[in-house]
């Protein structure tokens, strides 16, 4: 018997609300935090999100008969209350894997956070988490190299790596910029970094910066006997220009380059990650613009989703927040997305905001980068929070040392090694941090001065985007 077509508008929940559905291992699962307009039932708005982010539109169309909608449609299968928030609820939606292009984070994001976020029936909508099925994960390139390969390339083991963002971030000439890089690296840092908005400006063109920074790396390596690097920002206005900068960085022998993955876009990021994998370059990822997307607790995309998307798109480092510094970051939530960067399998853990199990299989991990308003007094907490597989990046906390960049770098290196040694001896580094640093400073005048300089500096502001479990 032929299918019949009934024109007109019908409620979304007639087709897309399926509370009896059992998600498959191959399904994408998404958790949206939703605030509907007044009078719109929860089931209807959950079904509307499922429809508008998959196969549905505002009216029935005859071409629905030309495909198997029951297979391809998104399914709203569960609704939950949000702790401490009577206005919002969680809508859980399952999507068949065939809705998304293989290996394309762009395809996934276009569907899940596309037009649906402008839907009039929604007052607010936030994508809290995605479960990427392992079958899909295996189609993505992931990090160009990963944590272990980076350690082997840089010949650094048993401790976090140390970095520094060169300041002032804008205005220096290429030669003065390179001098600042050299002083930091010879003082004891492993890496220095372009800030996110350092690209190719009239005061410092990219090619000049690359050359002076590479000279600084080679000179510092010769003096210290350690491998060094500087994150050369290849973010550009066009993909062609981005690849030209990456190619030049490879030619001069730099070990690591950088990309602003949100402003640059996932297409550019995945392409650059593929280039780095083929050409032996490490890739540092900055998250500039994330606060626009993830900070509002009711609308946007949670950073844990952006973290997963970056791991699939490709990057060896990713800025993760610090918990203790100047930037936004709830401790438990931060620990959750650090696990999502590094671990192979991350179980559901609502206490950290992780809504689904996530299996990355054999995909390499991403090194979290703690950066933003940190100094030597934060070192015990940073070592405790981030562990060894991380980069602790001090900008002003290096360059602001009264004795100069090299002294600031030396202070950070001494503080780091003292904390790592104390941890390895079984001490509770966070609780005993003051004593650990004070003892280390007896043998390091650079550390002593740094501790005196920043002893009163704190960033004690309440977190805006708290975990929902903390609102109870």
UniProtKB/Swiss-Prot annotation:
Keywords: Calvin cycle, Carbon dioxide fixation, Cytoplasm, Lyase, Magnesium, Metal-binding, Monooxygenase, Oxidoreductase. Induction: Induced by growth in high levels of dissolved inorganic carbon and low NH(3) levels (at protein level). Belongs to the RuBisCO large chain family. Type I subfamily. RuBisCO catalyzes two reactions: the carboxylation of D-ribulose 1,5-bisphosphate, the primary event in carbon dioxide fixation, as well as the oxidative fragmentation of the pentose substrate. Both reactions occur simultaneously and in competition at the same active site. Can replace the endogenous type I ccbL gene in H.neapolitanus, constituting an active RuBisCO, however the active enzyme is not targeted to carboxysomes. It is found in: Cytoplasm. Its EC number is 4.1.1.39. Its cofactor is Mg(2+). Substrate binds at residues 115, 165, 169, 287, 319, 371. This is Ribulose bisphosphate carboxylase large chain 1. InterPro entries: RuBisCO, RuBisCo_large_chain_AS, RuBisCO_lsu_C, RuBisCO_lsu_C_sf, RuBisCO_lsu_fd_N, RuBisCO_lsu_N_sf, RuBisCO_lsuI. Binds 1 Mg(2+) ion per subunit. The active site is at residues 167, 286. One of its GO terms (molecular function) is monooxygenase activity. The basic functional RuBisCO is composed of a large chain homodimer in a 'head-to-tail' conformation. In form I RuBisCO this homodimer is arranged in a barrel-like tetramer with the small subunits forming a tetrameric 'cap' on each end of the 'barrel'. The gene is cbbL1. GO terms for biological process: reductive pentose-phosphate cycle. Its main location: cytoplasm. GO terms for cellular component: cytoplasm. Mg(2+) binds at residues 193, 195-196. It is an enzyme of class 4 (lyase). The modification N6-carboxylysine is found at residue 193. The record marks 326 as: Transition state stabilizer. It catalyses: 2 (2R)-3-phosphoglycerate + 2 H(+) = D-ribulose 1,5-bisphosphate + CO2 + H2O; D-ribulose 1,5-bisphosphate + O2 = 2-phosphoglycolate + (2R)-3-phosphoglycerate + 2 H(+). Heterohexadecamer of 8 large chains and 8 small chains.
């Amino acid at each position: 018997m032929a299918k019949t077509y009934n024109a007109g508008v019908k409620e979304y929940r007639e087709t897309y609300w399926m509370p009896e559905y059992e998600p498959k291992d191959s399904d994408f699962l998404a958790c949206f935090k939703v605030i509907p307009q007044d009078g719109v039932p929860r089931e209807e708005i959950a079904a509307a999100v499922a429809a508008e982010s998959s196969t549905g539109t505002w009216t029935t169309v005859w071409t629905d008969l030309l495909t198997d909608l029951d297979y391809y449609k998104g399914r709203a299968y569960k609704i939950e209350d949000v702790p401490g928030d009577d206005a919002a609820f969680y809508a859980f939606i399952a999507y068949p894997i065939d809705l998304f292009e293989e290996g394309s984070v762009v395809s996934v994001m276009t569907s899940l956070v596309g037009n649906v976020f402008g839907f009039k029936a929604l007052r607010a909508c936030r994508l809290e988490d995605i479960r990427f099925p392992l079958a899909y994960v295996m189609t993505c390139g992931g990090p160009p190299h990963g944590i272990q390969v980076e350690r082997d390339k840089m010949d650094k083991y048993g401790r976090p790596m140390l970095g520094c963002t060169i300041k002032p971030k804008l205005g220096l000439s290429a030669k003065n910029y390179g001098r600042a890089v050299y002083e930091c690296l010879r003082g004891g840092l492993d890496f220095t970094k372009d800030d996110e908005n350092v690209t190719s400006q009239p005061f410092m063109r990219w090619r000049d910066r690359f050359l002076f920074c590479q000279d600084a790396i080679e000179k510092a390596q010769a003096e210290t006997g350690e491998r060094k690097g500087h994150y050369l920002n290849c973010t550009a206005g066009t993909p062609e220009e981005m690849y030209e900068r990456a190619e030049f960085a490879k030619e001069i022998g730099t070990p690591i380059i950088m990309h602003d993955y949100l402003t640059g876009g996932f297409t550019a990021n995945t392409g650059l990650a593929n280039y780095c994998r083929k050409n032996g370059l490490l890739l540092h990822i900055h998250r500039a613009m994330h606060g626009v997307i993830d900070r509002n607790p009711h609308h946007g995309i949670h950073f844990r989703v952006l973290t997963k998307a970056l791991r699939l798109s490709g990057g060896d480092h990713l800025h993760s927040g610090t918990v203790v510094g100047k930037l936004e970051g709830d401790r438990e939530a931060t620990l959750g997305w650090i696990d999502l960067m590094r671990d192979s399998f991350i179980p559901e853990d609502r206490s950290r905001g992780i809504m689904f199990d996530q299996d990355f299989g054999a995909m390499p991990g991403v090194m979290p980068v703690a950066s933003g308003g940190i100094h030597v007094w934060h070192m015990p907490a940073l070592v405790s929070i981030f562990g060894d597989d991380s980069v602790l990046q001090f900008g002003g906390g290096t360059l602001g040392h009264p004795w100069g960049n090299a002294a600031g770098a030396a202070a950070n290196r001494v503080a780091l090694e003292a904390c790592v040694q104390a941890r390895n001896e079984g001490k509770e580094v966070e609780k005993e941090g003051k004593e650990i640093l004070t003892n280390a400073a007896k043998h390091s005048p650079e550390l002593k001065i740094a501790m005196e300089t920043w002893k009163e500096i704190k960033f004690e502001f309440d977190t805006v985007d708290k975990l929902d479990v903390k609102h109870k």
